[in-house]
Amino acid sequence: MKLHELKPAEGSRKVRNRVGRGIGSGNGKTAGKGHKGQNARSGGGVRLGFEGGQTPLFRRLPKRGFTNINRKEFAIVNLAALNRFEDGTEVTPELLLETGVISKLNDGVKVLASGAVEKKLTVKAHKFSSSAKEAIEAAGGTVEVI
């Protein structure tokens, strides 16, 4: 193989389709916009959600629910993520933040039971699922709600 025999990967060099450049191009004259009408005009087209004057779907459906301004957002930590720590480590929210297990503290840390924990750890968090609590204690560790 020589340099002049190299070919780009199939589909990596797509040629831009220039419309409105002569009838022979297959996309001349109306440039793929059809004849007249709103969509053929410059700046033409209907707004998002417009259904030709029929009451649009988003207005036919009722409003539902509300946003709770007192909502608490917990940073989630699964048991599998706790295995990176050494036996006997005291796992605190600050340590989890430092080691990159969580990216933000939010309103606290909640430990969930996805995966298994094989180390004996002291875990301090704001909330625990009941199965996570049992799993940590079954591994010989302790659980402390902050």
UniProtKB/Swiss-Prot annotation:
Residues 1-13 have a biased composition (Basic and acidic residues). One of its GO terms (cellular component) is cytosolic large ribosomal subunit. The keyword Ribosomal protein applies. Keywords: Ribonucleoprotein, Ribosomal protein, RNA-binding, rRNA-binding. The keyword Ribosomal protein applies. Gene3D superfamilies: 3.100.10.10. It comes from the Bacteria. It holds the Pfam family Ribosomal_L27A. GO terms for biological process: translation. GO terms for molecular function: rRNA binding; structural constituent of ribosome. Residues 21-31 have a biased composition (Gly residues). Binds to the 23S rRNA. Part of the 50S ribosomal subunit. Belongs to the universal ribosomal protein uL15 family. This is Large ribosomal subunit protein uL15. It comes from Bacillus cytotoxicus (strain DSM 22905 / CIP 110041 / 391-98 / NVH 391-98). The gene is rplO.
